[in-house]
Curated annotation (Swiss-Prot):
<feature type="compositionally biased region" description="Acidic residues">
    <location>
        <begin position="193"/>
        <end position="208"/>
    </location>
</feature>
<dbReference type="GO" id="GO:0003700">
    <property type="term" value="F:DNA-binding transcription factor activity"/>
</dbReference>
<dbReference type="InterPro" id="IPR017053">
    <property type="entry name" value="Response_reg_B-typ_pln"/>
</dbReference>
<dbReference type="GO" id="GO:0009736">
    <property type="term" value="P:cytokinin-activated signaling pathway"/>
</dbReference>
<keyword id="KW-0902">Two-component regulatory system</keyword>
<dbReference type="InterPro" id="IPR001005">
    <property type="entry name" value="SANT/Myb"/>
</dbReference>
<feature type="domain" description="Response regulatory">
    <location>
        <begin position="25"/>
        <end position="140"/>
    </location>
</feature>
<keyword id="KW-0238">DNA-binding</keyword>
<keyword id="KW-0539">Nucleus</keyword>
<keyword id="KW-0804">Transcription</keyword>
<keyword id="KW-0932">Cytokinin signaling pathway</keyword>
<dbReference type="GO" id="GO:0003677">
    <property type="term" value="F:DNA binding"/>
</dbReference>
<protein>
    <recommendedName>
        <fullName>Two-component response regulator ORR23</fullName>
    </recommendedName>
</protein>
<dbReference type="InterPro" id="IPR001789">
    <property type="entry name" value="Sig_transdc_resp-reg_receiver"/>
</dbReference>
<dbReference type="InterPro" id="IPR006447">
    <property type="entry name" value="Myb_dom_plants"/>
</dbReference>
<dbReference type="InterPro" id="IPR017930">
    <property type="entry name" value="Myb_dom"/>
</dbReference>
<dbReference type="InterPro" id="IPR011006">
    <property type="entry name" value="CheY-like_superfamily"/>
</dbReference>
Length: 688
């Protein structure tokens, strides 16, 4: 039966060319005998010459024995002895024949796989005769594409340099060299046209079975493997027939056989690359996903940024946050205060420091899914979010010749402090009230004005939750506002003693009532003070920054030192204020309650003298150890107060609470009137 079927394909070449597609030779391969019989019947109705087999290995053997015996191959996908895709690959590589895949599986992935492996068409069972009547176009398309590619390869070989292959030197010289425009010369065109004509004649001679044929080499699997190994060793771009033949070292194999096989191999690779380039568009059109394609980026992780290690808590720099527009004289000018006035932003070395003994219990509250642990090096820089803290920068220079009884003769030399509100976390989490410095209309140097400068000053050191927003109003009367530096530190053993919050504010107002910020959550309390200087104080007594080295320190060894946690705010007349000022030199006081953790909080007290002013004095019980080299004057008018320093530190102050206190800022202004019972008053030296 096989011989009879093979005889059906023996038709003179001239007759086939005249009646094409009648007599087209088709090889049908299917393991199902019923489907194979139906396919054969339909192909015979289309007047094709059909050869059938139920095994892929037999079909491959037939093709290798006589590759010119068939024009088209139709193969099933699923076969027991050999997969249809494997047969497709071997046929396309060795014989360069059009192959049509046939299967009952019409899934997109299966069809795409067949097209990727080089199938020219994919038919679904049961096959219709209308589909089989048009399969001849694949044969014509393959012949024309092969001829065009052969001409292109020949053109590339003509343009190769002489050192690429010694065998091509003669052909390169014969073809001539291209002109300056890159176009081939007339001599090359004529040579190429002659080669095309000779190729057509040779094709007709080969198709004619009566013409003598050259002995052909059957490219077996082992022979093809040697060929592929030689090509891979040389490289597909530098592989030439002569070098491949030398590396293969096979008897009865000529250079022409290797050149022909190399050409088919290149065509096969080009076809695979062309199909692969169209694969993406096909998948996009069908709306599916192909597992053979390259995987794209992971969804949702494009904005991910890994934690980067930097210097430990590098954002906690003493001078890093004095960049707010409110601290810029030019920016102050845009808000109503002329930039030409001597309003200077303060820069100092006093910082808000935190000493942590057990760092593993402090965690950062971060946005989104970002998490940080201070126990892991305290050096986590979280992506693009840079943590910035609020710092209080204080002026450490001498405050001499600042206050003047005649007004602002030298400009407003006293510095106005504005707490920098650089964001610790993104703005959607930080709802901090931003300070504003306004003047209506401006600050004049020689006139007494009643304009007010509103500023928010204060620092919060939250143990559980803290909210501080201190509004202060400074009337610009006959004096220039001057700041008295306070640097305080206290230690306490339990956060509950302070109600979970401690804050330091330094407001100053001209009225008798004082706006004090308190946190209503957790029983938080705030303390601070404002000192008012009488207008009749002479200039010589107002020179701050004396050079004497007297310091008053609270003895750390004193066990009976008491610090009353209830602070009282009251108002006293300006005449009584002079007798309450009791510090002549720079002094510092320290309150300790047997703990090692500290939180230094700096604040500024702005003094302003008016006829009727309010004095804010915290009620504290402290003991001073005063040096004996100088006695304290009795009259406050003989005093000059250079600096008042105190230190404030909290042993139980958690870093998490400090962050929450800066993030969650709410303002609850409470007015304390004069009729509040305040208890005993102390001198200013004993209160600050």
């Amino acid at each position: 039966m096989r011989a009879a079927e093979e005889r059906k394909g023996v038709v003179p070449a001239a007759r086939r060319r005249d009646q094409f597609p009648v007599g087209m030779r088709v090889l049908a391969v299917d393991d199902d005998p019923v489907c194979l019989k139906v396919l054969e019947t339909l192909l015979l109705r289309c007047q094709y010459h059909v050869t059938t087999t139920n095994q892929a290995a037999i079909a491959l053997k037939m093709l290798r024995e006589n590759r010119d015996m068939f024009d088209l191959v139709i193969s099933d996908v699923h076969m027991p002895d050999m997969d249809g895709f494997k047969l497709l690959e071997l046929v396309g590589l060795e014989m360069d024949l059009p192959v049509i895949m046939l299967s009952v599986n019409g899934e997109t992935k299966t069809v795409l796989k067949g097209i990727t492996h080089g199938a020219c068409d994919y038919l679904l069972k049961p096959v219709r005769i209308e589909e089989l009547r048009n399969i001849w176009q694949h044969v014509i398309r393959r012949k024309f594409s092969t001829r065009d590619r052969a001409n292109l390869d020949f053109y590339e070989e003509c343009n190769k340099p002489p050192n690429a292959d010694s065998d091509h030197v003669h052909g390169h010289v014969t073809c001539g060299s291209p002109d300056q425009s890159g176009r081939p010369s007339k001599k090359r065109k004529e040579y190429c046209s002659e080669e095309e004509d000779e190729g057509e004649v040779n094709t007709q001679d080969i198709d004619d079975p009566s013409a003598p044929k050259k002995p052909r080499v059957v490219w077996s699997v082992e022979l093809h493997r040697k060929f592929v190994a030689a090509v891979n060793q040389l490289g597909i771009d530098k592989a030439v027939p002569k070098r491949i033949l030398e590396l293969m070292n096979v008897e009865k194999l000529t250079r022409e056989n290797v050149a022909s096989h190399l050409q088919k191999y290149r065509l096969y690779l080009k076809r695979l690359s062309a199909v692969a380039s169209q694969q993406v568009s096909i998948v996009a059109a069908l709306g599916g996903r192909d597992p053979f394609l390259h995987m794209g980026g992971f969804e949702g992780l494009q904005g991910y940024q890994a934690f980067t290690s930097s210097a430990a808590l590098s954002s906690f720099t003493p001078h890093g946050l004095l960049n707010s527009p409110r601290n810029n004289p030019a920016a102050l000018g845009t808000q109503g205060v002329p930039a030409s006035k001597s309003i200077q932003t303060m820069s100092g070395s006093h910082t808000l420091s935190h000493s942590i003994n057990d760092a593993n219990k402090y965690h950062l509250s971060l946005p989104g899914n970002q998490k940080g642990n201070l126990g892991q090096g305290l050096a986590t820089s979280l992506g693009q979010t840079q943590m910035q803290q609020k710092w209080i920068h204080e002026e450490t220079d001498d405050l001499s010749t600042i206050l003047s009884g005649n007004g602002l003769s030298n400009g407003m030399s006293g510095t106005l402090q504005s707490v920098t509100s650089s964001p610790l976390l993104p703005q959607e989490l930080a709802e901090c009230t931003q300070a504003k410095i306004v003047s209506q209309p401006s600050i004049r140097t020689s006139s007494v004005s009643s304009e007010h400068i509103e500023g928010a000053v204060g620092v919060s050191s939250g143990l559980l939750e803290s909210r501080v927003s201190q509004q202060s109003t400074i009337p610009l009367s006959g004096f220039s506002a001057n700041g008295l530096l306070i640097h305080g530190s206290f230690n306490n053993t339990c956060a509950n003693k302070l109600g979970g919050t401690s804050s330091s504010c330094a407001p100053a107002r001209s009225s008798n009532d004082l706006m004090v910020a308190r946190d209503t959550k957790g029983g938080a309390s705030s303390f601070g003070g404002a000192m008012l200087l009488p207008p009749d104080t002479e200039q010589k007594y107002l020179n701050f920054g004396g050079g004497n080295g007297l310091k008053q320190k609270f003895d750390d060894r004193t066990a009976d030192s008491l610090f009353d946690l209830k602070f009282v705010w009251s108002s006293v007349p300006s005449s009584q204020l002079a007798s309450n000022i009791g510090a002549h030199h720079a002094m510092s006081q320290r309150w300790n309650n047997s703990s090692s953790n500290s939180s230094n909080i700096g604040a500024r007290m702005i003094g302003q003298a008016t006829s009727s002013g309010s004095t804010v004095i915290p009620q504290m019980k402290t003991d001073f150890l005063v040096s004996g080299d100088m006695a304290m004057p009795k009259n406050a008018s003989d005093l000059s107060i250079p600096k008042l320093q105190s230190e404030l530190s909290s042993s139980s102050c958690s870093f998490d609470g400090l962050l929450n206190s800066i993030v969650k800022v709410e303002k609850d202004d409470v007015t304390f009137s004069d009729d509040l019972g305040c208890g005993d008053f102390y001198s200013l030296g004993a209160c600050i």
